[in-house]
Amino acid sequence: MKVFITQLIYVIPGKEDVFDQFEAIAIPIISKYNGRLLFRIRPSVETIIETSIEPPYEIHLVEFDSAQDFEEFKLDEERKQFLHLKKQSIKEAFLIEGTKI
């Protein structure tokens, strides 16, 4: 069953370039594991209708053919070599896993 991963990503101010370096490596790897990046959004004040939390720097919506594909993506050796960039640049993130209804 397909699984959808939504992430709300909060980047440390001033570390946007480091975050972009990590994304340039991680995003292409998604397709190796039957995944597709459906959306990568940087919301602005003008696009937010209502919120009770701090707006994230980016929102990602990714589809994988199965939960196992997502787990294998997280274990990818190339991606793991660059996790230090993620740790250096991300203040916090929310990961929401779901299915299509």
Question: Positions of the model-derived regions?
Answer:
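Short S/T/G/P-rich N-terminal loop/turn motif that feeds into the first structured element of a domain
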Residues: 1-75, 96-101
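A short, aromatic/hydrophobic, helix- or strand-capping loop or linear motif
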Residues: 34-38, 84-89
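C-terminal structural segments of small proteins and small subunits
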Residues: 69-88
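A short, amphipathic edge element
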Residues: 90-94
